[in-house]
Swiss-Prot record:
The keyword Coiled coil does not apply. Belongs to the VPS26 family. It comes from the Eukaryota. It comes from Arabidopsis thaliana. Its main location: cytoplasm. The gene is VPS26A. Gene3D superfamilies: 2.60.40.640. This is Vacuolar protein sorting-associated protein 26A. It is a peripheral membrane protein.
């Protein structure tokens, strides 16, 4: 029985290391089993290089039909788990068919890699970048090892960033004017604004501002939409009067935000909204939602 169990053990150990891995920023990433691991951070147009070590277990040799390393950018829908859509696929053949008797090291390099999308782990979808090493074998089955890495892309300040100003209300009952200082915010930004009451004929007991994330996956009849409330702020407690102005000041730094993602590879989108909620004394809710754009500022070091 022990012999049979041993037959299914891999013949070798494969490890993947990055050339500058020790000096590069590490980002926490959640695995499928919920475990948090640290992976190195890159951005588009960087060179991905390092070494692959293949070491046969004691007393074993590895017969193979070639060794290759792939750099893959993949999208996985959780309702179609296990099926990956590759939007980036680069391959390096690093060994010809032969045998490995002892530890062998292979250098690899992918120069100036185009990585247009950021790593994303959502409710129904994930986008990941991974190095995949394959020791190709026939009857014995190929041996495969993966190493994830994280991609974040930075952009400069937008040249145009208009404020958001809108008047909303219920006829003859409630009219408010809200204003936010910008329509585009970086991930460490502060949302500034004000809520101005033009007409108040219903008894409002409190007002909140929510930050919401809406993730859309799939297309057409197969579209899945998930909305999360990431943060909620009480702007006012008590009844406002006509002419009253309520300030808005929201720091984005504490929250787990990503940039806005628009129709990534025709697979998914991630949008953010500011949702203004007013509650009257009869617990009726009045709300107005406004989309904002989030981006990762180039000057950020995180």
């Amino acid at each position: 029985m022990n012999y049979l169990l041993g037959a299914f053990k891999p013949a070798c150990n494969i490890s993947i290391t990055f050339t500058d891995g020790k000096n590069r920023k590490q980002v926490p990433t959640k695995k499928d089993n919920g475990q948090i691991v640290m992976n190195p951070l890159f951005q588009s147009q960087e060179t991905i290089a390092g070494k692959i070590n293949i070491e046969p277990y004691q007393g074993k040799k590895v017969e193979h039909n070639g060794v290759k390393v792939e750099l893959l950018g993949q999208i996985e829908m959780y309702f179609d788990r296990g099926n990956f859509y590759d939007f980036t696929s680069l391959v390096r053949e690093i060994d010809v068919p032969g045998e490995i008797y002892e530890r062998k090291t292979y250098p690899f390099e992918f120069s100036s890699v185009e990585m247009p999308y950021e790593t994303y782990n959502g409710v129904n979808v994930r986008l990941r970048y991974v190095l995949k090493v394959t020791v190709t074998r026939g009857y014995a089955g190929s041996i495969v090892e993966y190493q994830d890495f994280v991609v974040r892309n930075y952009v400069p300040l937008p040249p145009i960033n208009n404020s958001i100003k809108m008047e909303v209300g219920i006829e003859d009952c409630l009219h408010i004017e809200f204003e936010y200082n910008k329509s585009k915010y970086h991930l460490k930004d502060v949302i500034l604004g004000k809520i101005y009451f033009l007409l108040v004929r219903i008894k409002i007991k409190n007002m909140d501002l929510e930050i919401r994330r809406r993730e859309s996956t799939g297309a057409g009849a197969n579209t899945h939409v998930e909305t999360e409330t990431l943060a909620k702020f009480e702007l006012m407690d008590g009844a406002p009067v006509r002419g009253e102005s309520i300030p808005v000041r929201v720091f984005l730094t504490p929250y787990d935000l990503t940039p806005t993602h628009k129709n990534i590879n025709n697979k998914f989108s991630v949008k953010y909204y500011l949702n203004l909620v007013l509650v009257d004394e009869e617990d009726r809710r009045y709300f107005k939602q406004q989309e904002i754009t989030l981006y990762r500022l180039k000057e950020e070091t995180s």
